[in-house]
């Protein structure tokens, strides 16, 4: 009888735990996806902060020339980064227990893999948590669908691209200047500016910004006045009110006359679906462009494609881009020190001022 009561008590405790995890009454919804999301994101955040502040230099190119990325090794907020794992590791899974020592793990950039893999797991669980909360509240699932766009973009630069290129050292560094360096090298090696999916992604991001500004300004300009001139129009809105707070007919009429009639939505639901769809599809396409270029399916190359009747090349914008790509690729060459010695991190070495005599 005692054993039966203990089983019931433990089952009851488990049921209470399940109801707490899935309760929509909590201040922050946890959910079953949150059970995995919380520890993975906390781990990624903690290791990122520690590595950004104090990680020793990493041999990113596998040529015994470590690159310092942390604040304690001379960087600032702009130049600092968590340096990607060494090219000597490639795309091998490199947890702490695979290294001979902690020093070796740090030297080969182990923290980068730890941060990236935990981060991607965490944000994937965040998608699931959004869907889970929407499901329990009886909402439609489009919030989680929209969030797949930035997650796909992150997965493209942190996971798919390194896999395609054969090494985590080709992944995007976790820092500001490291991100810019990644973008310049990506352009030099893959001509991303001439990739149609990336061009559509640019249209998605900038178009989404334009549509957001247009929508916000139209709504703000057509608010239904319910306050005096001496009060803010915002005071007229009450959270949860049923009546419209702006005149969609006026906004539709204004925009239809400003451009043309059919450029303006007369359905608020289809309008907001479009506002969500446009940037999401654009970022999906950008992630797809990076994922295809990861396997060297690069942007279009129209270099020296325009010639006159004598066969002489007529330079176009494509040739200018090609020249810039070559310059960026040369500057990125491993073990080629293009910068002055006072910008280098190591000690300056003496240089011979006279050429040696060559007999013969």
Swiss-Prot record:
Origin organism lineage: Eukaryota, Rhodophyta, Bangiophyceae, Bangiales, Bangiaceae
Transmembrane segment boundaries: 29-46, 118-133, 142-156, 197-218, 274-288
Family: Belongs to the reaction center PufL/M/PsbA/D family.
Annotated residues for binding of [CaMn4O5] cluster: 170, 189, 332-333, 342, 344
Gene source species: Porphyra purpurea (Red seaweed)
GO cellular component, one term: chloroplast thylakoid membrane
Protein name: Photosystem II protein D1
Residues binding chlorophyll a PD1: 198
Note: 2 of the reaction center chlorophylls (ChlD1 and ChlD2) are entirely coordinated by water.
Record PTM: Tyr-161 forms a radical intermediate that is referred to as redox-active TyrZ, YZ or Y-Z.
Domain of life: Eukaryota
Cofactor binding, per record: The D1/D2 heterodimer binds P680, chlorophylls that are the primary electron donor of PSII, and subsequent electron acceptors. It shares a non-heme iron and each subunit binds pheophytin, quinone, additional chlorophylls, carotenoids and lipids. D1 provides most of the ligands for the Mn4-Ca-O5 cluster of the oxygen-evolving complex (OEC). There is also a Cl(-1) ion associated with D1 and D2, which is required for oxygen evolution. The PSII complex binds additional chlorophylls, carotenoids and specific lipids.
Membrane topology: Multi-pass membrane protein
Catalysis: reaction(s): 2 a plastoquinone + 4 hnu + 2 H2O = 2 a plastoquinol + O2
GO biological process, any: photosynthetic electron transport in photosystem II
Keywords: Calcium, Chlorophyll, Chloroplast, Chromophore, Electron transport, Herbicide resistance, Iron, Magnesium, Manganese, Membrane, Metal-binding, Oxidoreductase, Photosynthesis, Photosystem II, Plastid, Thylakoid, Transmembrane, Transmembrane helix, Transport
Positions of the record's site feature: Stabilizes free radical intermediate: 190
């Amino acid at each position: 009888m005692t054993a039966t009561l203990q089983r019931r008590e433990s089952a009851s405790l488990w049921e209470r735990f399940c109801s707490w995890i899935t309760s929509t009454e909590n201040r922050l919804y946890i959910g079953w996806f949150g059970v995995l999301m919380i520890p993975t994101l906390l781990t990624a955040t903690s290791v990122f902060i520690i590595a950004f502040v104090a990680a020793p230099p990493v041999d990113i190119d596998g040529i015994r020339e470590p690159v310092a990325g942390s604040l304690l090794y001379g960087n600032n907020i702009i130049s600092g980064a968590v340096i990607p794992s060494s090219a000597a590791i490639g795309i091998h899974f490199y947890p702490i227990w695979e290294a001979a020592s902690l020093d070796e793990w740090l030297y080969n950039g182990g923290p980068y893999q730890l941060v990236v893999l935990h981060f991607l797991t965490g944000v994937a669980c965040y998608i699931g948590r959004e869907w889970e909360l929407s499901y329990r509240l009886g909402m439609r699932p489009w919030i989680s669908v929209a969030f797949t766009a930035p997650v796909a973009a992150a997965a493209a630069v942190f996971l798919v691209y390194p896999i395609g290129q054969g090494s985590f050292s080709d992944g995007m560094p976790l820092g500001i200047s490291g991100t810019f360096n990644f973008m310049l090298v990506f352009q030099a090696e893959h001509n991303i500016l001439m990739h149609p999916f990336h061009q559509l992604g640019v249209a998605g991001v900038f178009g989404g910004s334009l549509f957001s500004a247009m929508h916000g300004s139209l709504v703000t300009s057509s608010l239904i006045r319910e306050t005096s001139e001496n009060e803010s129009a915002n005071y007229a809105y009450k959270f949860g009110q049923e009546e419209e707070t702006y005149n969609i007919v006026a906004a539709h009429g204004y925009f239809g006359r400003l451009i043309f009639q059919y450029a303006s939505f007369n359905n608020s639901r289809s309008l907001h679906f479009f506002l969500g769809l446009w940037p999401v599809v654009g970022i999906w396409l950008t992630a797809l462009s990076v994922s295809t270029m990861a396997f060297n399916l690069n942007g279009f190359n129209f270099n020296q494609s325009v010639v006159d009747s004598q066969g002489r090349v007529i330079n176009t914008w494509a040739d200018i881009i090609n020249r810039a790509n070559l310059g960026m690729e040369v500057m990125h060459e491993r073990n080629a020190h293009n910068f002055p010695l006072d910008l280098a991190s190591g000690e300056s070495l003496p240089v011979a001022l006279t050429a040696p005599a060559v007999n013969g």
